[in-house]
Amino acid sequence: LSTTPEKKPAKRSSKIKIDPNNRIVIKGAREHNLKNVDLELPRDKLIVMTGLSGSGKSSLAFDTIYADGQRRYMESLSSYARQFLGQMEKPDVDEITGLSPAISIDQKTTSHNPRSTVGTVTEIYDYLRLMYARIGVPHCPICGREITQQTVDEMVDEVMKLPERTRFQVLAPVVRARKGTQAKELDAARRAGFARVRVDGNMYDLSEEINLEKNIKHTVEIVVDRLVINDTVRGRLADSIETALAQANGLVVIDVIGGEPMMFSQSYACPEHGISVEELTPRMFSFNNPFGACEKCTGLGTFMKVDPARVIPDKRKSIRESAIKASGWYYAEGSISEMTYKALGKRYGFTLDTPVKDFSKEALHALLYGTGDERIEMQRESMFGSGTYFNQFEGIIPNLERRFRETSSEWVKEEIALVMSSEECPACHGRRLKPTSLAVTVGGINIADFCDKSVNEELDFINTAKVSTRDEMIGAPIFKEVKERLGFLKSVGLGYLTLSRGAASLSGGESQRIRLATQIGSALTGVLYVLDEPSIGLHQRDNDKLIATMKRLRDLGNTLIVVEHDEDTMRQADYIVDVGPGAGVHGGEIVAAGSVADICKVKRSITGAYLSGRKFVEVPETRREGNGKALRVVKAHENNLQDITVDFPLGKLICVTGVSGSGKSTLVNEILYKTLAAALNGARSRPGQCEVVEGMEWVDKVIGIDQSPIGRTPRSNPATYTGVFGDIRTLFSNTQDAKMRGYGPGRFSFNVKGGRCEACEGGGILTIEMHFLPDIYVPCDVCKGKRYNRETLEVKYKDKTISDVLDMTVEEACVFFANIPKIARKLQTLQEVGLGYIQLGQAATTLSGGEAQRVKLANELARRDTGQTVYILDEPTTGLHVADVHRLVKVLDKLVDAGNTVIVIEHNLDVIKRADYIIDLGPEGGSGGGAPPAPPPPRGGQ
């Protein structure tokens, strides 16, 4: 990396002229910190909004422009529809004209539902279900023979194979698992002269009134005939089957009394095994529908089973040394678990101090899986005396699995889930569907095999698949849609993904690009897209594909507003808006707007200073040598990692890089962090799979700083999260006035009764429900928004009340509490990470992702470190302007200079060039990634 800034030539142009007939005009925007902003934006262009973190970019793009576009659309709906959609508050703006319907694409909406896959998220799977339903060839799931249509004679022959004198009834399934009262079908059955009907397994006489619940799925079967197998029944049976087929669109059910029911279809059946396949419908291929989902795993493809290795993670320990780490089975003196362990030890020859590795095979099996029918002697002691009784022992693992199934407590489920692992379903082998659905093929492969191919392979298959001329004509429109959507995924660099990949396992960059590809596939025009930092998590190579995708969306006739700090995106944009000049109260203005050249000319634009090369992040003259010790992850094989062994040298700033999907988060977050957290911090998270992590003796603690919010309610704020508010409350309780009144620290909390205003319960605002209008938030009439009651506000420190302190910015509070070291140190760290502009009492819900992450970083910086701490940060430059990145790098340097180790997953070149050591994973994403990293150059990645 060069030690001098690269100055890309800025195209010199006059100020961009905006067509007055094709523009978006914003007047008087005052949302959050915006200062009465007036702005004109060109329509049908790629617009980038940039500026320091907290400058007001998101307030303008999302909370003003997008919010108003969405609100206007919702207000056009009926009041009946609006009650299900919730209300959107009108942004604080005088007027916006030229708006289109708005769609937001951010990274916070990745699905964590285990049923969501790449195929379902992109809606490609819906087209595949239709394709297999229309041109699929059914086969017998047992013998694999192609299934053809059945005639009435073949159905009669199959029924006549039943033993002599077998009683059965012929049913016509007119409704199958469908919501509604089914009154129309029941009336039709009455008019046709039928006497009985079976509804949801219960028999009814059609002469009586049958009332069915409207919102529950029902199955309705008309009883056509009741028969007994004998030599004379064949003719009547044939007539009854024909009648049932006519009533139920080619389906008939033979309900054998005391036996298994038989279903026949005029459509398809295997003559050898008698397996009938009903008419192929799209729902047969849905793993989210009972008609298609595997019955054993209900369409998940996996089972959660208790893992013995997680129940006893370290067999070198004894039971008394807490070898058993499972909910309800921790060792404690006087507990039922201790009594059970003693009884098992007496029977199988071990004590509470015997290491588990020395247990006999029989003893370990009894401990984990129970004693079966054998009763063992239990000795129970209590304050009322002792007693002996004999009882069977269920076993730790069966006990945990039973409690997991039966409990209604989410907390208990989460506790037990810590010792469970996911196993492939033995029935469908992870394919999610019923055998009959998996036995349908197109071009020789079933739908699960198709989805297991990569996007690139699927495109090749569709282009070369051999189908009949008739099927080709029927499937042509479906092939076209599938090919287009697969092509869009390939064009955004996701050709390595499979459609069966779980959506929850996707990285932020992958999920963002999938949603972009889906929008291109929808081919909408005249839409306003608002994107939140789409380059987050993207390697420079992937970024080029992303920019091309956004341009393609623009070329369809849409307007794109992108909140972004990436330099390449800015240089490729049609129009740039720089919000600033500073952050918080120092921002909220339009510093510059126009082309890159226009931005570079504006002296007060910090963005312009970096784009023009006047400012830059320096490359260090020397690299740190570290302390000579290292953490080593041996043979990591979680997700796509290919048994790689990686060294993390201690005492250095380490960057883990690689293209999107190459395995960075798996290696660092899932394996290294979770293993260290379990060993050093006592965390109970489940680490990813590797042989061992060596070198943990050189580290005393690990701290992970992720991108999740610091709180989800307005009551959470930076002061409460960092703990500084506790110190401030203690300070107020130590004032002379507070002592005279007998006030403790709790009096100054707005979350508990005593000192808070009870009218608003310490919130400072009241919510007024307006039903079909947005809720209105007004300051509390009693406390005037100050959160506390009058008596509490009479206590002051340096002429400031506790409410005044919450309203201070970090910058102001640093000066105010300069003489209180405990408070000043915590506030100073907030200032160091660039959060001097936020208020101490600012609601967590109003903080951006970048701000929330830096609050966490400041919180960790304020703690005392020993110089042997490992800090792990995932994309710390998220939401950061290059000026903020400059400041962040200095903070990270400070941590490493104190002897600590900082490991960052990062694509930002300004951070990478400051690293002492670089680990580059790849070479590709998905199955093409996870390969052993190349050894760094002699100077540690310069």
Spans of model-derived segments:
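Conserved phosphate-binding elements of NTP-dependent enzyme cores
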Residues: 1-942
